[in-house]
């Protein structure tokens, strides 16, 4: 994700981020399935999706910590 996409994610609610996380996990599952069957065209996409999942999880955790501090 680009920096501006990350800024857009930070504005989203926790529910929207959870939905995005579920979508990314489903995409990762499909990519891994394609890899196993030899149909994956762009193996770099797996790395990108995993990084996006980590970024969304980080933003969710930041929001959790912000709520705890208040």
Swiss-Prot record:
Gene3D superfamilies: 1.10.287.310. The keyword Ribosomal protein applies. It holds the Pfam family Ribosomal_L29. Keywords: Ribonucleoprotein, Ribosomal protein. It comes from the Bacteria. GO terms for cellular component: cytosolic large ribosomal subunit. One of its GO terms (biological process) is translation. SUPFAM superfamilies: Ribosomal protein L29 (L29p). InterPro entries: Ribosomal_protein_uL29 (IPR050063), Ribosomal_uL29 (IPR001854), Ribosomal_uL29_CS (IPR018254), Ribosomal_uL29_sf (IPR036049). Belongs to the universal ribosomal protein uL29 family. HAMAP family: Ribosomal_uL29. NCBIfam families: L29. This is Large ribosomal subunit protein uL29. It comes from Clostridium novyi (strain NT). The lineage of its organism: Bacteria, Bacillati, Bacillota, Clostridia, Eubacteriales.
